[in-house]
């Protein structure tokens, strides 16, 4: 599975969008200071994510978020996203996905 995610900086609320296969490891990497583009605004927390079966679909969605969605639109999406889904996922170590969670498969 592939994840498209939006991180929120706890320093100033800046948003960062990316995609990965391991969302837990990627969040830890961002918070470790090893990712140049997020180093200065650490710590980060997971604000939103979507799940895809194919990497190409996740990459397409990531580009869509980056090119077609402005910051305010992303913030509205995060505000409406159910925080419980994120907490369950982070505790699960990717062994299952909470329901109902949309998995995109084309």
Question: Where on the chain are the PLM-derived regions?
Answer:
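Structure-specific nucleic-acid interaction/processing domains
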Residues: 1-17, 21-106
């Amino acid at each position: 599975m592939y994840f498209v995610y939006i991180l929120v900086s706890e320093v100033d609320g800046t948003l960062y969008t990316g995609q990965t296969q391991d969302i837990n490891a990627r969040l830890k990497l961002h918070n470790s200071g090893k990712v140049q583009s997020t180093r200065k605004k650490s710590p980060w927390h997971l604000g939103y994510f979507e799940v895809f079966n194919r990497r190409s679909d996740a990459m397409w969605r990531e580009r869509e978020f980056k090119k077609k969605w402005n910051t305010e639109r992303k913030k509205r999406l995060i505000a409406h996203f159910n925080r419980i889904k994120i907490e369950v996922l982070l505790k699960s170590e990717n062994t299952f996905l909470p329901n109902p969670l949309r998995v995109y498969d084309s």
